[in-house]
Amino acid sequence: MYNDNMEDTILEILLLIFVIAIPVLKFIFEYNQYENSSYRQETNNSFLSVYFNKGLNGEYHLSRYLNSFQSIGCKCLFNVYIPRNNGKTSEVDVILFHPKGLFVIESKNYSGWIFGNESNKYWTQVLPVRRWKSHKERFYNPIMQNATHIRAIRKHIDDTIPVYSIIAFSDECTLKDVTVKSNVVVTYYSRLYKSINNIISNSNYSITPELLNQTYEKLSQFSNVDYSTKIQHIYNNR
């Protein structure tokens, strides 16, 4: 009887260690993966700040779908605070610099169902609460939001450079009814690479390496901004 109890206790302890070890190992793996990522190098955001911030976490996961472009020499900027004529700033989530143009990406790390029309000022996120019940949240039209970003960017770059607008939603949500009639791309994180490649394959324009580098250097001064700039941005856009 004593041996049986001892064996049961040992098994329970081993099971407890196993249950604790899995999330710890997962956390360590994710930490190491993040520390070696291009997103970490570009933004200097700490792992914990990204881990606990839904917006930054979405940008990080989105950035991983851009690794194929970065592996061929393309550059990215994240959290770019572009000055506007009115003294305010536009916070751009991601800019991909490609010989075919600039891809300005608005990241939406949302869940639930998404409803929206390009011409409507607000879109709707529907979240399940319990069976037969749901909760609705309105959010500003991301196409209009990104259009503001692009207008701000245009003030700082060569007029001949093509700029493409892409709205990328997390795969945790479903684009239930989204109507877009312009050339703006609304897609999921997982389809981002394919969406950008479709634009690239249909473009006959090419930016010279010199102009592309100049553009990157010019816009990079607006990334990795200090804390006061971020606070001022929030205050100005209340």
Where are each of the predicted segments found?
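Surface-exposed interaction regions that form or flank ligand-binding interfaces
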Residues: 2-90, 97-102, 108-113, 129-238
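Short, flexible, mixed-charge acidic loops at enzyme active sites
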Residues: 114-126
